[in-house]
Each structure stands twice: as structure tokens, then as C-alpha cells.
Amino acid sequence: GWEGQPRVSPDMKAYSKFDFQKSRIAVEVQFGHASFLGTDLLKFQMASYSNLDLIDFGVYITTTKAMQKFLTNQYGHNWDGSLNFEKVEKYLPYFKSAIQVPIYVIGIDV
């Protein structure tokens, strides 16, 4: 099964954890602030390269703008500054020189 909250590396402190991992696939789920994107992506890189060789690829899951709009209209949730699929799609190319591990991005939509 899936392991919850596995460390990026056995030698790293508690703050360096994935949300889930199974075999050599790491998963990050991010509905929070957009500023977490860089940190989340670097965790994939650290676990794949940097002499760790613990994963083959990462999966990054977030909401879409449409889902955020729906949740705002239905429940009044404030998404100001939050990450979404479209932001990941926009900023991911800027990380391509630093991130060599494949990352599959999933946007949860309505």
C-alpha cells in the first residue's frame, strides 16, 4: 500500500516529507499557498538524484482555477495566493534546469 508522510531521506528532519509514497513514486498534494511550489518540487529532485535514488518520478496534485471558483461560490472559501494547476503549469518550465526527475501534474477539477 501507500506509505503516508514518508521522509524524503532517512537522514532528513521531519519537515522533509512527501504526502505519500509507494514503490518509487512520490506524491505531493498541495492546496495551500503558491509559495510552497518550489519546496515541493525540490523534494522530488532530492529524492531522485542527490545520491538518494529513492524515486523514479513524482506526482503533484492540486486544484484547478475552476475548482477553486466552485468552492468559493459554494462555500465562500478564500483562495487568494493559493496554488492551482494553472500556476504549476506556468511556473514548472522555470524549474527545468534544476529539476530533472519527471513530475506528473494533476489538477482536481469540477
Q: Across the structure, where does each feature detected by a protein language model lie?
A:
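Active-site metal-binding core of divalent-cation-utilizing nuclease and nuclease-like domains
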Residues: 1-23, 35-42, 49
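Cysteine-centric segments in proteins
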Residues: 6-11, 58-64
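Short, flexible loop/turn elements at secondary-structure junctions
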Residues: 24, 31-33, 109
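Short beta-strand-loop-alpha-helix junction that forms the active-site gateway
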Residues: 28-39, 65
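Arginine/glycine-rich "motif VI" loop of SF2 helicases in the C-terminal RecA-like domain
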Residues: 47-54, 94-98
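Conserved acidic-Pro-Pro-aromatic motif
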Residues: 50-56, 62-65, 70
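Domain-level recognition of nuclease-like catalytic cores that cleave nucleotide substrates
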Residues: 64-110
